[in-house]
Amino acid sequence: MAKLIRHNGAPAVEINGEIFPPMMATIRTNNRDSIIVDKEYYRELGKSGIRIFFLICDTIWLKPNAIELFEEEANALLEVVPDAYIIPRIGLHPTNEWIMENPGEVFKYNDGTSPEAYLFSESYETLLPGMYSLCSQKWREKAGTELLKTWNQIMKLPCAGRIAGCFLAAGGTSEWYYILPAVDEEKGLYGDFSESFKREFGKYLKSTYKTEENLKKQWKNNNVSFENPIIPGLDKHYYKHQVDIDAMMPRNMYANSDSPNPPNNGTNIGSFADFDKNVDVYDFWRAWHIGVADSVLYFADLMKKNYPDMLVGAFYGAYGCTDYFLNGTCGGTVKLLKSKSIDFLASPSVYENRLNGGYAGQRQPFDSFLINNKMYVVEDDTRTHMENDFYRDKYDVYDMTDTIERMKRDFGRDICINVQAWWFDQ
C-alpha cells in the first residue's frame, strides 16, 4: 500500500510501512519504439539510495506492444535494484485515427482551421492531424477506458507487487499543455472554437453565474448564453502581448521629451486587462485552465476508484513558467489540491535561471501543497556537460566539475525548501 504521510512537517511517501527519502528518478529509456537499457546506471542509482523509479509507459490503445516494452524495462530495473518501487508514467494521448474521426474534439481557431501539431513525449512522437482538446469528454471517456485496460494488464505482471502509483501524462511533453497557442496575434488567430471547449466553457459559465441573466449582466452582453459562449476576440487580448510591442517607442526619447501616452485600446490598464470591460476574457482563461484540470481529475478519480492503494499524480501548475499560461496548465491547481484523488503534482524547475550563480526556482507555490497535505515534486531535469552544444552553451555547463556543482546546487535547493524531487536523465 502506497500513501502520503506527514513526516517531519512535510508530506513523505510511505509504501508498506516504509518511509522513503525525498529523491526519486525518472528513467528515459523507453525511446519511442525501442528500449535502451543501462543496467549499471540503474544499479548506481539504487546504490545512491533511490528506490522509487518512474518508468515510461503508454496505453495499449496507442501502442499495442506497450505492456511488453514496460515489462522489459521493469524487469531490467528490478534485476539490479530488486527493492525498487515503480510508478508508471502513462501517456493518455489518442491515436491519430481517433483524432481524424472526432473533429469536434480538436482545437479550432476563429478561421475554422485545426492546424497539425507536433507531439513530442518521452516515448511517443508524431505529427498530430490536429491538437486534441484537453477538455474533451469523449477523449476522457475513451482514454479512461484504455487507461484501465492497460493498467489491469500491468497489474497481472510478475512485477505488479512493486507498482506504487500512477503518473498521468497528456498534452505536450506529457505536461498537460496545448501544443498550439490559444491566441496567436501574429497570425490573427484565436480560439478555441471546438465543440468540446464550447461545451466546457458553457459548463463553467453555468457553474459560475447560475442564470443567463447574471451572465449577460456581468459580461454586459445580451447575446451570450450557456449554450453559445462567445470566445473573446484578439482586441480583448491586447494586454497580453501587443501592448508591450506598442510600448516600444519607434523614436528617440530625451530627458525633456513629453511623456508618451501609455498604449491602450480600450480594454487594458497597462499590461493588465481592464476587468470591468473584460470579464469575458477572465472567464475564458479560467475555463481554459479548469477544463484541463478537470481532465486530470477525471483520470485521477478513475484510478483511485479502481486502485485506491496507489499514489496518483500528474504534471500541472506551471505558474512560474508564464509562457505556459496560454497553454492551460496552471489555473486549476487549487481545484486539484482539494481533490482526494490527487496525491502529488509535478513540474520542472524554471529554465531561465539555471546558469552558474542561478537558483533554478520553482514553478509552483509549493507551500500551498503543505497546507493541503499534498506533495509537490520538482523534476530536476538538470542539463549536464554530456548534453548537445546548444544546451551546454545555454546553461553554461562544459565539464564534469560544472555538472557536479549544478546537480549539488539543485539537490541542495530541494532539501532547503523542503520539496520532493526526481532526477530526470534528460
Placement of each model-derived feature along the sequence:
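N-terminal carbohydrate-binding accessory modules
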Residues: 1-45
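Acidic (Asp/Glu)-rich catalytic clusters
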Residues: 42-47, 73-83, 158, 334-340, ...
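Short catalytic/ligand-binding loop motif for oxyanion handling, primarily in non-cytosolic enzymes
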Residues: 62-63, 94-100, 172-178, 320-324, ...
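The substrate-binding groove and active-site-proximal loops of carbohydrate-active enzymes
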Residues: 21-32, 53-67, 124-145, 204-205, ...
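Structural preference for beta-strand elements that scaffold enzyme active sites
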Residues: 22-24, 52, 83-87, 163-167, ...
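Polysaccharide-binding and catalytic clefts of secreted carbohydrate-active enzymes
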Residues: 102-336, 342, 359
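Hydrophobic targeting/anchoring helices
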Residues: 307, 313-426
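Aromatic-lined substrate-binding rim segments of carbohydrate-active enzymes
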Residues: 37-120, 141-144, 151-155, 298-306
